[in-house]
Amino acid sequence: MMNDVIMDLSTLISKLKDKSPFKYNFKVNSEEFWLSESSNETYVEPDFSIISEISNCNLEEAQVILISAVGATGKSELTKRLSYSLKIPVVDLGQTKVVGGNSLTGLIFQHLKPLEGGQWLEDIQNGKTCMIIDALDEGYQKTNTQGFFDFLDDVGEKISKDDCSFIMLGRTNAIELASLYLDGQGIKVAVLQIEPFSLEKAKEFIDKQVCKTNTLSAQHEVSYKATRDYVLDSLGDFFKAKGKQDEEQGNKFIGYAPVLLAISEFLNSQKVGNYKMLFEKLKKSKVKSISLILDIMHRILERDKTYKVVPNLIMGIVKNRSTEFKKVALRDAYTEEEQCARVLYILLGEDYPFKPVDDEAFDIEYRKGLVTWMPDHPFLKGRKPANVVFECYILAKLIGNNKYKDAVYRYLNKTQISSFMFFYLFKELNKKQNIDAEIIVTTQHPYGHE
């Protein structure tokens, strides 16, 4: 898809600043309809581009603004910042029980007094204010396609003829479907996409993560920034050496939020202790950029298991099981290799065929839970790789495993990949293994993914 017009969050907010702030009281506090009343000081404002292929107007003309975001790019924090800055409430479809015809109207009157709810909807329709709807993709999962369209019809009935009435956020697939449907209903839609951070914003992101729990002294700050820049420069140099197209991929990789979180963990002040010593160690060992990339991959995968899937899915499934079973499940489920394989099967459009834990009851609940979690995996952008680095890492990691080898070759036979990236990663991951002639033949394609 072609992306045009880069703008920052402040520019987007300024285009909606004439909207009247929400002035009513909710009947009860809830997670499905709320107003953000605080600002996250560690939040770094993203930039956006307009996806021209699925937009039918510019931002100024839009009756609906759709914001597309892949998993782990800070969509939830963006929603909070929009709500806080504009003083406009959020309907979170991830928390609602029902999504369908009139469900939006019903939700509003469930949480507001009748006269106030009616007045607020009238103000939306007259263009005086607007509403934020988050987790459009999760709403789609709770219904069928017709139910989703019925929900969008409910939205359409409340739209101003001349002004923006709704800002809706969600994953790529649901946003694209909503855009096509609303366009078919004659509604003016502008679709935005969250862009990777620029180098300066990447540095700001890392700084805020590293310093959020521990302020650095002036002396430590100088050494910290030198170490931070060394890591970012090492990663950037790896891509620059391979040509302009790969340099652009490198900028996208370095500016991707999950990558920056991994770098922040690597530079965590409580773990590092002495930045000057770390900096000298990195320089002295001439640490290769490929080693840094592998460290980042490990941290991203470890983080997805430790902070997301274990507490939010696995622990709930095993809570009534024996101590020994819990130990096995926590060890064997959602390993780094399994995560890579599950992403590969999603890219192939196939179901994952293996059981990481040999227990039918666990497997049923685990598979069901991952239907929700896997689309948000940081290696994915919809049903495509989030970045060429993730794509090649998955293939290089799995191709030496007989369990997944056929799936890797099926992917290679139908997809163009970055050969140089694949071979660099393969060599580093499989130091004791020679490269098969079949791998060389299969991967000799021109550069593939954007």
Residues covered by each model-derived region:
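Aromatic-residue hotspot detector
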Residues: L66, L78, P385, F390, ...
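Extended amphipathic alpha-helical scaffold segments
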Residues: M2-I13, T129, Y352-P356, Y366-G382, ...
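Extended hydrophobic
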Residues: I175, D183-G186, F197-K203, C211-K212, ...
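P-loop NTPase signaling cores
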Residues: M1-L292
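Residue-level signal for threonine
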Residues: E45-F48, S52, N387, T415-S419
